[in-house]
Every structure is written in structure tokens, then in C-alpha cells.
Amino acid sequence: MTARLRVRALVLAAGLAFGIAGCSPLPVRTVTIGDQPWTVYEGSANGMRGLPGFGDVDGMLFDMGRNVDPAAVGFGMEDVGYPIDIAWFDGSGALVSTASMAACEAPPCPVYRADGPYRWAVEGRVGAFSDMGPEDRLVVED
């Protein structure tokens, strides 16, 4: 089994476990982006799939645990019925890139990737990252 297939299998298994366990409500934490505090869900392999929207939180945070190659890990919108914006940050919190992800209710759905290695990804409402610049940083405290 190739490394890419192993990663996909692990993501699928984690997603199935999340769905079966019904881990709702999702854990919530606060991070800072630029000078703004954000209340975020802690992301899972399912991301926003099956959720009606962000509700009372600002977004969803994904921690890869270390900087990862964007060619190996991408984000998709399958079964998400609304558009989402995403920002990727490296291990020091520096902005790597942003993208707008279109809603996709049925495959095939595009895969969105950062422009460079990243540790953190934050999904937010459309327009959430439109004013971000290279000086804006993500701060995640343990």
C-alpha cells in the first residue's frame, strides 16, 4: 500500500469512527488570528461534513501536528452544502495561503491544497480571511 493510500485509509477510518461515535457537540477552543480571537471547533477527518454551518463559532481548526507537504494532505468539500474559506498556517503561525472552497454535494469534488508546507488549517465563513496579509499570524495555545 502506498503512503498516499495509507493516509487516505487513516483519514477514512477516523471519519467513520467520528460518524459512528456521534461526537457531537464538537470540542471548542479559542485561537487568535491577527489580533482577533476566534472560537473554533477542533477539526476531525469529517471537517464540516454533516454540520449545518458554523453556528456560534467562527470556524474549525485542524492541527496536523507538524508541518506537512500540501501534496500529501488536501481538503475537500464533499457533502458540505455551503461554501467555506480556508487559511493555512505553518508551524510558527505564519500565513501560508488562503482559498475559497465551493460547496460540493456530490463527487467528484475538487481538492484544495495550501501553497506550501503547513501545520494548521482554519476553515471559516466566506470572506473570513479576505483582509489577511503576511503580517497576520495564528496563535494556538495549549
Residue ranges and their predicted role:
Residues T2-L10:
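Bacterial N-terminal signal peptides that target proteins for export
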Residues S24-D142:
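Compact, glycine-rich, soluble single-domain proteins
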